[in-house]
Swiss-Prot record:
Function: Component of the tRNA-splicing ligase complex required to facilitate the enzymatic turnover of catalytic subunit RTCB. Together with DDX1, acts by facilitating the guanylylation of RTCB, a key intermediate step in tRNA ligation.
Oligomer and partners: Component of the tRNA-splicing ligase complex.
UniProt source species: Mus musculus
N-acetylalanine PTM sites in chain numbering: 2
Name used for this protein in its record: Protein archease
GO molecular function term, any single one: metal ion binding
Length: 168
């Protein structure tokens, strides 16, 4: 498992972006990006299933911008369900991507899972953040879609581990 560390990608932050980032404590990062032909594979993990879901969402958003420059000015909730853990993960990420790209242009600084019903595969989550603005948030790479391709969910032992390929 990769070490927990800060995102070391160079976003060429402005002084204003650096000041925003320095205002808040860093969010725990338990994910990494793995190369995949023409796409990117998110590798996220957590001590609990909830944390693995949270880290996977933040890995997706972290690919689009430096989430450290996001201020927690408002909240957005996402409720989703699936037929199994893989489809629940797919729909969870897809709903959060919708909040960013098609609905509210919402970018979270942090996502927390409030409840997972593992029997019925339902999930409630909340994100703290703000509307994405190119003048405030450095532009990373746009995520076009979540895919089922090579999706893996390991939740039989700790840590919980997810692998998800995102279409960029």
């Amino acid at each position: 498992m990769a070490q927990e560390e800060e995102d070391v990608r160079d976003y060429n932050l402005t002084e204003e972006q650096k000041a925003t980032k320095d205002k808040y404590p860093p969010v725990n990062r338990k994910y990494e990006y793995l190369d995949h032909t023409a796409d990117v594979q998110l590798h996220a993990w957590g001590d609990t299933l909830e944390e693995a879901f949270e880290q996977c969402a933040m890995a997706m958003f972290g690919y689009m911008t430096d989430t450290g420059t996001v201020e927690p000015l408002r909240t957005v909730e996402v409720e989703t369900q699936g037929d199994d853990l893989q489809s629940l993960l797919f729909h969870f990420l897809d709903e959060w991507l919708y909040k960013f790209s098609a609905d509210e242009y919402f970018i979270p600084r942090e996502v927390k899972v409030l409840n997972i019903d593992q029997k019925n595969f339902k999930l409630r989550s909340i994100g703290w953040g703000e509307e994405f603005s190119l003048s405030k948030h450095p532009q990373g790479t746009e995520v076009k879609a979540i895919t089922y391709s090579a999706m893996q969910v390991y939740n039989e032992e700790k840590p919980e581990v997810f692998f998800v390929i995102i279409d960029i």
